[in-house]
Amino acid sequence: MEEFKRYLELDRSQQHDFLYPLIFQEYIYALAHDHSLTTSSSLELEKAGYENNSSLLIVKRLIIHLITQMDHFGFFTNYSSQNPFLGHNTTLYSQILLEGFVVVVEIPFSIRIISSLDLEGKEIVKSHNFRSIHSIFPFLEDKFSHLNYVLDLLIPHSIHLEILVQTFRYWVKDASSLHLLRTFLHKYHNWTNLITPKKSRFSFSKQNKRFLFFFSNFHVYEYESILAFLRNQSSHLHSKSYRPFLDRIYFYEKRDHFVKVFTKYFQAILWSFKDPFMHYVRYQGKALLASKGTFLLMNKWNYYLVNFWQCYFYMWSQPGRIHINKLSNHYLELLGYLSSVGLNSSMVRNQMLENSFLIANVSKKFDMIVPIIPLIRSLSKAKFCNLLGHPISKPVWADLSDSDIIDRFGSIYRNISHYYSGSSKKMSLYRIKYIIKLSCARTLARKHKSTVRAFLKRVGSELLEEFFFEDEFIFSLTFPKASSSSGGLYRTRIWYLDIFCIHDLANYE
């Protein structure tokens, strides 16, 4: 935010209507380059050749070509033989231009956020902890335990390219920028799989993750903002997170059209939004809509969402993508956890004068458990065990040193242990530890051409325990009371604030 505010001191008339000239500025590509260095790993940069190929000289050549050539979009055509100036670097120039373009199109959104916060006298708080995936689970524990039904839906993503361009036109009215956006979208035509983690978009995400994340979030934000707008029209519980964006002309045009077509039924439709206990959570291209209402109310939400996507975004949503489940008797597959709302019963003895009696107290509890079967299936897919959960060796790691092999296996277990540290029933992690630990021993024995028993007898079993119990030792120092009792370590629930991505083994769908 501060980078945009420092570098992009634009005139008010240029903030939205004349973004295209910024593509000719060198500092735009410097910002894109710095962002790639800070957000990408060295391995990704090495594979992409970014460190070796990106330089100020290449950027200057790119800008000169954009200024002198009439065809600014020639990077996307196969004419390298006709243009000796570009030669074999057409792909590189196209990639650099794409990265600079993403920085440019982010400007209206960033300026709108900064200006709205300045008007309200608020500061931009860097709440990095709220980015953690684990931050969502305490919210679910606090809210979902009082709810009855949940709408589990898969967000439709197959939107037409021109629909996206037309929607984006309300943010950026610069025709040249829109033409460049259309060119990028048609070049990377498999962008329609942005939302769901499919293999078809893997190659695209490797080329420019920032473009991927920006337009996937923009696509989802469009319909979420309209839902928030309608929600705020019928409830006093206004959502502050959408306030900076709700004054757009686009939303009011949609609202006016909505009222014009459904004037007679507008109040009846808004009745569906009047549930004060409605909660919305989005994750991995999916969403949860939970309510304390009845099955009839959730069915109305189902009907509305399907028609909403089809009428306003021309996206077909199959009825099988939306499921209405009762929280008390159905498990939710949420971010690698199995979650449900169960009944927690307890007996309280009450004494009144000479009479004593027992009172049965029943309360709801939102419970998360480790999905052991999908985890074993993921370990089997990664060649740590077979489908029955029997550990096997990892031959591809046999050429590494002993310390590297142990460190890799230990790191995998620590990641899994951290991710599922918030589960109330973590005893199944014993089996995961057994699989990874014995797979490590089999790999080391394979490397030294020995049996597992002979290898452990020669080096001692403490060699593996040191790595696999390191996390538990640190936990016992931090929470001595929890670890002092038998099994206390596996009964205590801990949510971490540094988990920003789902572990590969947890992403088993």
UniProtKB/Swiss-Prot annotation:
This is Maturase K. Pfam families: Intron_maturas2 (PF01348), MatK_N (PF01824). GO terms for cellular component: chloroplast. Keywords: Chloroplast, mRNA processing, Plastid, RNA-binding, tRNA processing. GO terms for biological process: mRNA processing; RNA splicing; tRNA processing. It is found in: Plastid, Chloroplast. Belongs to the intron maturase 2 family. MatK subfamily. GO terms for molecular function: RNA binding. Usually encoded in the trnK tRNA gene intron. Probably assists in splicing its own and other chloroplast group II introns. InterPro entries: Domain_X (IPR024937), Maturase_MatK (IPR002866), Maturase_MatK_N (IPR024942). It comes from Hottonia palustris.
